[in-house]
Amino acid sequence: MAKSLLASSLSVRTKILQTGVSLYNTTHGFHEEEVKKILEQFPGGSIDLQKKQNGIGILTLNNSNKMNAFSGAMMLQLLERVIELENWTEGKGLIVHGAKNTFCSGSDLNAVKALSTPENGVALSMFMQNTLTRFMRLPLISVALVQGWAMGGGAELTTACDFRLMTEESVIRFVHKEMGIVPSWGGASRLVEIIGSRQALKVLSGTFKLDSKEALRIGLADEVLQPSDEATALEQAQEWLEQFVSGPAQVIRGLKKSVCSGRELYLEEALQNERDVLETLWGGPANLEAIAKKGKHTK
């Protein structure tokens, strides 16, 4: 009986990791269509996606009049873009950045003020947790390019990316305590995964302004880019990402899937996932070409 329950639990966890599967449904008290109707009432800004032929996507937060704060419409569009990326089989990498040299200042306060009941807060939390968890599980190697400020929900969004690049003048700040709340888009859990529980508690309770040097020191940032304008920084980010996404898309996507399963699944299930991914690659075009080109004993 116990083995049966464990196998069932593992199966559920594995299914959750599958691309395109929502984190919540009505059994969790989550009514997605109702939340969407509420968010539609708060227009403004856009989430723009460019899918390049080299397999790198560019996701732009565009609401520059409000430091790229998330309006309700932008939250809806972010989910739409995630679904689009889930179906982009040629994709290998993704860069997330904000328009006009600012990453994101969090949620638009107009929406926050209107959604002031605990019920609305929890519904919004579940919507964004679902979106950003699906984002995190995309079979794409993702990079947050932080220019200017990444605050509140913007700081949480950076943690959903695999890597974070910062320009010298940029700042990441989790301001939730000063707003009388806690991170609710999954940011606290992901921050613990990235920098450890002790550092995460300091960052969240201290509401520190993490400049690029401090973020690099504690392991939140992966590299600091030289001073540059928006276009040049984006070019630098693409060059940085290219070192990790060179090669066949199927292989890069398989690597990301393997890392996701290793992070989120029990060991036995993660090992099974490794074998499942390997089965799609072993003896495939990339594998056979590499063997023929390099030979078994060459370096």
Curated annotation (Swiss-Prot):
Positions where N6-succinyllysine occurs in the chain: K209, K293
N6-acetyllysine PTM sites in chain numbering: K209
Keywords (A to Z) from UniProt: Acetylation, Cytoplasm, Lyase
GO molecular function: carboxy-lyase activity; methyl/ethyl malonyl-CoA decarboxylase activity
Entry's Gene Ontology cellular component terms: cytosol
InterPro entries reported for this sequence: ClpP/crotonase-like_dom_sf (IPR029045), Enoyl-CoA_hyd/isom_CS (IPR018376), Enoyl-CoA_hydra/iso (IPR001753)
Listed name of the protein: Ethylmalonyl-CoA decarboxylase
Source organism: Rattus norvegicus
